[in-house]
Amino acid sequence: MAKFIQHIGLVAPLDAANVDTDAIIPKQFLQKVTRTGFGQHLFNDWRFLDDASKVPNPDFVLNLPRYQGATILLARENFGCGSSREHAPWALTDFGFKVVIAPSFADIFYGNAFNNQLLPVTLSEADIDTLFQLVKENEGIEFVVDLEQQTVNAGGKSYAFEIDPFRRHCMINGLDSIGLTLQHEHNISAYEKQQPEFLR
């Protein structure tokens, strides 16, 4: 996995609370088990006027010219609620998002995000309100999300957030569960050599 230390990116404001995983990636697109190819279906029912023609909805935030290429999603409370599909962070990262900033996240989505190198940043509702206004008034504004310092820098101000130290360590060092295991490969090999022949 790629290391996540600091990210600078354009911000797209999704001004909706309780965005569930079925809105993020509808169930009809879940047949695949690989992590790629889901970005084209991200927010499918909101991005397109109908599923057959795939005509873009001109009013949806991700279709607006000013937010093309956004890599940071600004959202409202309880983002990622609903079913526990891991396809939701897959779709967000495949579309190009590196960070989601919101007042709160559904627990399962929050864990899945870290597992897929998508950084979920929790800020207070007051700070989120300020950031929505900032993005609305400043076309092309970029945020600096610093995982080492645990800050979001925007509009000349710094907003502090907290990440569990273990998860922070894993993201900064680009470690997934396999990578963590391989860090102890020497100890695992030594233990295996100590086992009786019939257990090897």
Curated annotation (Swiss-Prot):
It comes from Yersinia pestis bv. Antiqua (strain Antiqua). It catalyses: (2R,3S)-3-isopropylmalate = (2S)-2-isopropylmalate. Its EC number is 4.2.1.33. Heterodimer of LeuC and LeuD. One of its GO terms (biological process) is L-leucine biosynthetic process. This is 3-isopropylmalate dehydratase small subunit. Keywords: Amino-acid biosynthesis, Branched-chain amino acid biosynthesis, Leucine biosynthesis, Lyase. It comes from the Bacteria. It holds the Pfam family Aconitase_C. One of its GO terms (cellular component) is 3-isopropylmalate dehydratase complex. The keyword Amino-acid biosynthesis applies. One of its GO terms (molecular function) is 3-isopropylmalate dehydratase activity. Pathway: Amino-acid biosynthesis; L-leucine biosynthesis; L-leucine from 3-methyl-2-oxobutanoate: step 2/4. Catalyzes the isomerization between 2-isopropylmalate and 3-isopropylmalate, via the formation of 2-isopropylmaleate. Belongs to the LeuD family. LeuD type 1 subfamily.
